[in-house]
């Protein structure tokens, strides 16, 4: 398990590709990206960035993204995600998978040119209390310090089960996973829906996802305990939280080897994340555009 804790930059770059997709194994069955059997290799050159919500941590730039995919019967490996699909049919499949957790990625170091630090904005209350009620909306006061002195967050691995159902041009999926690396013993699940549009060589994919993360997982990455308080941060105990995502992808197929690809993803973090003094922004926008070459 220490291999994941000291994960190389190359493996993290591979994981960046996986972080753009809405579900753990949904990308492994998209005919626009992958083959059904054998080895599929590729690389895309372009520009983009993965938004980083952590205080004083830069957005992660994306330039050259490799693609490594292996399919052998019911087993597959795609962009650091391993899957076994023992149950499948013409329009459904059930898979067991193992993948890296994206939250640990926000705390790792990268050698690429860093983007500007994101700026947080206040979140006003939805409705004021009625006059004379004596009830006040609690105000979360974040005290921040030196982010370099907080305790180390390691990149964890999650394993679970996912079910996918395809209906006409729609794909619906649900997954639930638990941690393997024993860092936070957290749980994570999600529901997602995607709609595919095909126009000759043009492909458009629209998706929406709701993720649920357990209190243990949120507290491990975004909680503030003794060491964080010593570094100047206010205390915070993580609680179960949600991530809400919208995603749009566009591809243009020049031929079997060359494609233009683009992805944009908006993600909203619930108050369980936003109230943490380690979180700088709860509205995240990630994107990438470039040319992909399939070997």
Model-derived segments and spans:
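Cleavable N-terminal export/targeting peptides
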Residues: 1-37
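Short glycine/proline- and aromatic-enriched beta-strand/turn motifs that initiate or cap beta-hairpins
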Residues: 27-78, 82, 104
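Outer-membrane beta-barrel proteins
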Residues: 29-33, 51-53, 72-87, 167-169, ...
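Outer-envelope beta-barrel architecture signal
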Residues: 35-41, 62-64, 75, 88-94, ...
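Residues on the lipid-exposed face of transmembrane beta-strands in outer-membrane beta-barrel proteins
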Residues: 45-47, 66-72, 83-86, 159-165, ...
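Transmembrane beta-strands of outer-membrane beta-barrel pores
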Residues: 47-53, 72-74, 98-104, 167-169, ...
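Outer-membrane pore/translocation modules
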Residues: 81-190, 198-201, 205-207, 217-238
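Predominantly the C-terminal beta-signal and adjacent terminal strand-loop region
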Residues: 251-295
């Amino acid at each position: 398990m220490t291999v994941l804790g000291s994960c190389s930059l190359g493996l993290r770059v591979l994981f960046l590709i996986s972080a753009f997709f809405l579900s753990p194994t949904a990308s492994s069955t998209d005919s626009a990206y992958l083959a059904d059997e054998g080895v599929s290799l590729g690389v895309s050159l372009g520009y983009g960035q993965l938004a980083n919500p952590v205080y004083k941590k830069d957005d992660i730039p994306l330039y050259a993204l490799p693609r490594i995919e292996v399919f052998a019967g019911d087993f597959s490996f795609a962009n650091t995600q391993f899957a076994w699909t023992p149950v499948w049919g013409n329009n459904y499949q059930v898979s067991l998978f193992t993948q890296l957790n994206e939250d640990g990625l926000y705390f790792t170091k990268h050698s690429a040119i860093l983007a500007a630090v994101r700026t947080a904005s206040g979140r006003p209350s939805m409705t004021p209390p009625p006059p004379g009620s004596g009830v006040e909306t609690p105000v979360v006061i974040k005290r921040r310090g030196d982010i370099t002195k907080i305790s180390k967050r390691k990149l964890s691995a999650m394993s679970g089960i996912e079910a996918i159902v395809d209906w006409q041009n729609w794909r619906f999926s649900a997954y639930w996973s638990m941690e393997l690396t024993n860092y936070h013993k957290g749980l994570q699940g999600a529901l997602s829906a995607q709609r595919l549009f095909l126009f000759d060589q043009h492909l458009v994919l629209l998706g929406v996802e709701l993720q649920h993360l357990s209190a243990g997982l949120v507290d491990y990455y975004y909680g503030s305990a003794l060491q964080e308080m010593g570094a100047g941060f206010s205390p915070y105990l993580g609680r179960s939280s949600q991530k809400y995502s919208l995603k749009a992808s566009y591809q243009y197929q020049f031929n079997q080897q060359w494609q233009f690809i683009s992805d944009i993803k908006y993600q909203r973090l619930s108050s369980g994340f936003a109230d943490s003094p380690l979180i700088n922004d709860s509205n995240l926008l990630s994107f990438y555009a470039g040319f992909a070459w399939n070997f």
